[in-house]
Structures are given as C-alpha cells and as structure tokens.
Amino acid sequence: MIKQIQKIESKTKTKFYLGKETNSKPALMNNKLIKIFEDYSKSKKIKSLIMPSGAGHDSSVFANYGIPSLMLFVRNKNGSHNPREYMDIKHFMQVFEVLNGVITNKL
C-alpha cells in the first residue's frame, strides 16, 4: 500500500499523512439499538439499510467496553473522506429526524 501511495503522491504532487494507527478492535453494534432505530425509520417511512462497516470511530471502542453502540451513516454521493465528498441536505435531515425522534421518544 505504501508503494501505491508514493506513486499517487508523485503523480499528483500531493502528500498523504496517514496519521497514527488507532489499533481499535472491530466490534458488533447493539442489536436492541439497531432494532429501535430501524423500527422508528420504518414508522416515518424513511428508508434505512443495515450493513456491516469497517468504520470504527469511537463506537467500536465504546462497544468493546460494553457500552451499547451503533452508527448512523448519511448517504454520500461520492463516498466519504475524499475531496468530492457530497451529502444532500435531504439525506442529512432524514438521519437527523430519526436520531432526534428516537432520542426524544424511544430512549
């Protein structure tokens, strides 16, 4: 991977900074929370997708310490973590509506 990065850097005259490894371990998200969020989404006719993710962020650290966790993702036209990253405000507001609704009414 380092060789590929070096090729890209040379070709594009850019520099990658990979940062420190977090060494966080993969974790399963909480099935009860997933069901609550899924049911709320359905009740509001907001399409949702349950999927595995390699993203860890803080949720995997919390989950590995026994803290019930899950992650909500906002649909992103060009994928995340790239210069062309783009999110439609409609999709952002749908996730906000679900998060706010669950926190306000279900938890």
Feature names for model-found ranges:
Residues 1-15:
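Acidic-enriched catalytic cores of C-N bond-cleaving enzymes acting on peptides and small amides
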Residues 2-4, 74-107:
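His/Asp/Glu-rich mid-to-C-terminal helical/loop segments that flank catalytic regions of hydrolases
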Residues 9, 41, 103-106:
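Hydrophobic pocket-lining residues that define ligand/cofactor binding sites across diverse proteins
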Residues 12-15, 19-74:
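Active-site-adjacent substrate-binding region
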